[in-house]
Amino acid sequence: MSIYPRLTALAWYWNRLRCMSAGEVGHRAHQKVMSRLQKFGLAIVGGVPPADLSRVARSFVGRDSRVTRDPYIRAPAGILAGEMKVFNLDCQFGATPNWSRDPKTGTIAPLRFGKTLNYRDESVVGDIKYLWEPNRHLHLVTLAQAYHQSGEQRYLDALRHQLESWLDQCPYLLGPNWTSSLELAIRLINWSIAWQLIGGVGSSMFAGPDGAQFRERWLRSIYQHMHFIRGHFSRYSSANNHLIGELSGLFVGCVTWPFWPDTVKWQQVAKDGLEHEALLQNAADGVNREQAISYQQFVLDFLLLAGLAGRENDDAFSQPYWQRIESMLEFIASVMDVNGNVPMIGDADDGYAVRLSQEAEFCPYRSLLATGAVLFKRGDFKVKAGQLDDKTRWLLGAASDKTYADMPANNVTLPVRREFREGGYFVLGSEFETSRELRVIADAGPLGYLSIAAHGHADALAFTLSVGGREILIDPGTYAYHTQKKWRDYFRGTAAHNTVTVDGENQSEIGGNFLWLRKANARCEVWESGTEHDRFVGSHDGYRRLDDPVIHRREILLEKAGRRIVVTDTLECAGQHQAECRWHFSEACEVWLEGKVLYARNNGSVVSLRLVEPALKFELHNGEEDLPCGWVSRSFDVKIPSVTAVVSFAVQGRTSLVTEIVCSY
């Protein structure tokens, strides 16, 4: 057996330890001891207390939702046939899924004690993302929606069969589905929604002695889920979106099933935690501190679901909590272009807390804005959202249609905001919300959140450009998470972003798949926005760690009348270096060179790039594998070729690279 995987694991543990405080080391040691005790039957749920079913909660999903029935009745056809789509993979699960099997690799994870099972080891669990995804049970909500809309028994029977098989195969604390509190929390949220849609405690699923026995069994697992989450919150450097998801799952669980005395105190713990983390993990300007747009929507769903559950059950969240949600929606509205495109900044794994809409053109970002428009009476959110979506209808009920329709959407100012200084993003542009819109999103934010910055990318001073709602310069996305290290490192590295690399190095040092060591510190030095131009100047110190330290400073000057963007990259050092500036184009772009001028066209929007220094040139790359270059990933585990233009230049002392971008449409 090769010792390389063992050495790699040791390196990861060492790097992880380097990012921990003394307090965290103590906490982790305590958790290890507790896991060992639990493995031998100590400090776990023994007998689950009897459930007092007289304490019934009010539903917060599905209250007279005015949705078109047919899509929801058709949606479970694949599930009934034993088929399911996991990310972009069509999977055959059969009538009874193997809940410990990774559908991508076929690996079956062992039914060992979950908290000591190494889910990062591909040889043990396969690709854990693929294993966990169906166990989140978003598809059970699809079955419950079909039953809710049709009343057909077959959907209820299928839902029960899926649940019974899961309870059979995933006993308390054993296997890969008892390793991550976040996964339990998401499953609990989807169980809650399914429970509500089938009629709650009085559902016909629970009729007769057999039904009552099944209900008791399901409730026993629900209690165990809540007990597990309460005892295994993500803390210290892991207290990111995971903690918010865990708190949300616990809160929703306690509200939905208030059948035990413990749920009263757990609900308060979860609510207090959410109130705190909502303000801590999301900047006052609305930017989620993970520095990842996908996690912005992920966290928003958790906060909204908990907030709505509390609102309907006499446990309302505070005004600052809801104000922070509104600010987060303002950020999404501001970075979204006129056609609804949102830049793929930071990590994305196609993970969702819930899947309530079966609309073909469903967009999670527009959906959130539609929900926000109704909740906060925001006409500007309505403009960005377009039509009211079904997810909003399921969450807010029939009244949402009238509220949305009656809401005035004229005389609104867009973008909502241009400057997100605390979060580190700046919106440059002109003629917003028109067919001639120019929208640039410049990044001078932190690498990520907390000491590991788990979901951040090394993208300091990068920017994206859309013209008339058509993407030109993009962030290429994420593609990989726990596996395929080469591609994981590429897509989150500096070379996969519209910025400058020095000596082939990342701005920040990778320490593991979700771990950064020495981190670049970026800052905005100048921000100006006026009628004639927008100007951004930012810098970062990521390359100061080199033997000969380098500072990278970038100025972006957008001249509105001429639709011209001048990008000046200045590198300051004492010695000599080799640098590269990369431009990543949307896969929808046709890209070509005419002499030394680079052109890109996306459905009528044409942009030219010209280097002021005549000795320099663009080199085009497309879909290169060995040294990855020229790729975009719109979905998890899916990548397609796209054009990347690379400009290589020597650096000696103070050196500047000037690129002129002209947008002709």
What does each model-identified segment do?
Residues 16-20, 28, 32, 36, ...:
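Beta-strand-rich N-terminal accessory domains
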Residues 98-103, 108, 414-417, 424, ...:
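Beta-sandwich/jelly-roll carbohydrate-recognition scaffolds of carbohydrate-active enzymes
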Residues 287, 291-473, 525-530, 651:
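Carbohydrate-active enzyme catalytic cores, enriched for enzymes
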